[in-house]
Design a protein with these regions (language model features):
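Conserved coupling segment at the C-terminus of the helicase ATP-binding
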Residues: 320, 324-328, 333-335, 367-371
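Conserved SF1/SF2 helicase motif Ia
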Residues: 386-389
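Conserved pre-motif I regulatory segment
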Residues: 332-367
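Walker A/P-loop
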Residues: 362-383
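Well-ordered alpha-helical segments embedded in enzymatic catalytic cores
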Residues: 78, 82, 349-354, 379-383
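Accessory nucleic-acid engagement/destabilization modules that flank
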Residues: 6-327
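Short acidic-aromatic active-site loops that bind/stabilize oxyanions
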Residues: 68-76, 155-156, 340-351, 373
């Protein structure tokens, strides 16, 4: 997994290139002021049963000789749900605050965005270039009237990886919903890099041309794009992300914040892709001689919650250190709480001063000199906790 977290350079160059283009503009461009989008409530009980058969027919994972699978929508639900657990129970407070910094510190919005990104990262697997890799499961897609040729017939499929299809689909969806296209591009790159690698600008240009004009494009068969859009809109409702928000703009995405989202997204995908945590399901059966999604039993909302909870428990991720805040002027209560002192105990002057200075100044290093009996042991532990926060 660590290898997937280190390839940020091309992504950073892409963002910096966009900034340079903006700076080199020969004349100032007056743009209509756009407000930040409002977040709708998340419909967390939304399962896949309400999606069209076409949106449900695409495969994301397969195994056991293609006798088992996960559909795209099932894998995306798994990734979205485990992202919620990651945000709530694994990411540090600093990590969450960094993600929320572009949302005026609102961690609920940061959480919704993270869950949405995890829930659409593999929407690009709704493409013939990916679908052709399983002969058996391509039958399920063909049953919906879509053309999937043999893998060898897609000579240029390597130029359009599914991560970039996810990226292009997301930025198109935000723009189509009335959002600012440039900001949409910044955020959509996060799903494009979910394998930890991002191609150079020329490779992205070639991929975008294929996305627009080759097999599975709007020019070829718009139903592929319609299925992706349906999945994106469904996940936006499920996670509470403002995908359709006319006249708005997502916030600027600083590199540090982008790295915070992208690194967490890699972990969410890694967990959701582990078959020990999120087992494959039986593949669709044949009906009238054809393998079809028709009649396939999707998991209910309750079953999906149980699946996500079971997967998270199996992963057994450690909980981060959670250090309580120190209320101003309450050094005594802090020490009593941290060390189990009775109410009659009072911290020494050195102990009170150390916590107050650490809270106020946030130094990188503290050196405390005090006479014996000043409580330097508890002082050191208390000050260290404040600095770690």
């Amino acid at each position: 997994m660590l290898a997937r977290l280190v390839a940020w350079n091309t992504y950073l160059l892409e963002v910096e290139k966009m900034a340079r283009k903006k700076t080199r503009a020969s004349a100032p461009v007056v743009q209509e002021a756009r407000r930040a989008p409002d977040f709708p409530p998340a419909l967390t009980d939304l399962d896949a049963s309400g999606l069209s058969a076409c949106a449900r027919c695409f495969w994301a994972k397969t195994g056991d000789g293609a006798r088992a699978w996960l559909s795209v929508v099932q894998h995306l639900m798994d990734a979205a749900d485990v992202a919620g657990y990651l945000f709530d129970e694994y990411l540090s407070e600093h990590h969450r605050r960094l993600m929320a910094s572009v949302w005026d510190g609102d961690q609920a919005k940061a959480r919704a965005v993270f869950i949405f990104l995890a829930g659409v990262h593999d929407a690009g697997k709704v493409s013939p270039q990916f679908a052709c890799q399983s002969v058996e499961l391509a039958e399920v897609i063909r049953d919906q009237g879509l053309a999937v040729m043999r893998k060898m017939d897609y000579a240029e499929r390597a130029f359009l990886p599914h991560g970039l299809v996810s990226q292009f689909a997301l930025q198109d969806a935000v723009a189509a919903g009335g959002g600012d296209a440039r900001r949409a591009h910044q955020w959509a790159i996060l799903v494009g890099i979910h394998h930890g690698r991002y191609p150079d600008s020329e490779a992205v240009r070639v991929a975008h041309l294929q996305y627009k004009y080759q097999e599975g494009s709007v020019a070829d068969d718009p139903r592929w794009g319609q299925a992706r859009s349906e999945i994106l809109e469904w996940m936006a409702r499920r996670s509470g992300f403002p995908l359709i928000a006319p006249g708005t703009a997502l916030p600027e995405l600083p590199i540090a914040v982008a790295s915070a989202y992208a690194s967490a997204l890699v972990i969410a995908d890694w967990l959701a892709s582990n078959e020990d945590y999120f087992p494959l399901r039986p593949r669709p059966d044949k009906a009238d001689g054809k393998r079809t999604i028709r009649g396939y039993p999707e998991l209910s909302a309750d079953q999906q919650r149980e699946r996500a909870e079971r997967g998270w428990k199996r992963a057994a991720f450690p909980s981060p250190l959670r250090i309580p805040e120190v209320p101003a002027g309450e050094g005594g209560e802090f020490y009593r709480h941290r060390f189990g002192w009775p109410t009659s105990y009072r911290p020494t002057e050195a102990q009170r001063n150390a916590v107050e200075i650490a809270t106020r100044e946030d130094p990188d290093l503290m050196i405390v000199e005090a006479p014996p009996g000043s409580g330097k042991t508890e002082l050191a532990f208390a000050a260290a906790e404040v600095l770690m926060r």
